Amino acid sequence: MESHNTLNLDMEKDQEKAFDYSKRAQWLRAAVLGANDGLVSTASLMMGVGAVKQNVKIMILTGFAGLVAGACSMAIGEFVSVYSQYDIEVAQMKRETGGEIEKEKLPSPTQAAAASALAFSLGAMVPLLAAAFVKEYKVRIGAIVAAVTLALVMFGWLGAVLGKAPVVKSSLRVLVGGWLAMAITYGFTKLIGSHSHMYV
C-alpha cells in the first residue's frame, strides 16, 4: 500500500514537472516569436524608408517609431488576449471547485503584456543598432541585412528547438520569410517613391 502511494506521488511530481516545462516552453516560444516579429517589421520599415530617403536620422527615427508602436500594439493585444483566457479559467475554476480560485495557476495578463512588449523591443533593436553607427547608405543597408539575417537564423533555431521541429527547415523558413518581407517592402516603396517624383 505504501509503495503504491509513493508511486502515485512520484507520478504526480513527474506530471507537475512536465506541466511546468510545457508552460515555460510556451512562454519562451512566444518570446521568440515576439522578438522575430519586432526584428522583421522594424527592419522592413527601415528598409522601406531607406528606399526613398537615404538619411540615417530618418531611418533611425522611423525604426524607433516602429519599435514603440509595435511594442505597444503587442502589449495591448497580449493583455486583452490573456485577460480573456483569465476570465474563462476563473469561471471554469468556480464551476469545478464551488467558488475557490487558485490564483497561482492563472495566467497573468500584465506579465504577458510586459513580456510581449519586451520581446518585440529586443528584436526591433537589432536593425536599429546595426544602422545607428553607419553613415554610408549602401554599407548601412548591408549592415541591416547582415544583422537581421544572423538574428533570423538564431530565432529560427530557437523556435525549432522549443517547438521540437526540424532545425534546418525551421531556420530556413524564418530566414526566407524575413528576407521576403524586407525585399517586398523595399521594392514597393522604391516603386511608389519613383512614381511620386513624376507628379511633384
Swiss-Prot record:
One Gene Ontology biological process: intracellular manganese ion homeostasis
Family to which this protein belongs: Belongs to the CCC1 family.
Catalytic activity, reaction form: Fe(2+)(in) = Fe(2+)(out)
Conditions for induction: Induced by iron supply.
Function text: Probable vacuolar iron transporter that may be involved in the regulation of iron distribution throughout the plant.
Protein known as: Vacuolar iron transporter homolog 3
GO cellular component: vacuolar membrane
MF terms in GO: manganese ion transmembrane transporter activity
Gene deletion effect: No visible phenotype under normal growth condition, but decreased accumulation of iron in the root and increased accumulation in the shoot when grown under high iron concentration.
Disulphide linkage map: none
Organism: Arabidopsis thaliana (Mouse-ear cress)
Places the protein is found: Vacuole membrane
Vacuolar side: 53-59, 135-140, 195-200
Keyword Manganese attributed: no
Keywords attached to this entry: Ion transport, Iron, Iron transport, Membrane, Transmembrane, Transmembrane helix, Transport, Vacuole
Signal sequence coordinates: none
Transmembrane parts of this sequence: 32-52, 60-80, 114-134, 141-161, 174-194
Positions in the Cytoplasmic compartment: 1-31, 81-113, 162-173
Keyword Transport set for record: yes
Membrane topology: Multi-pass membrane protein
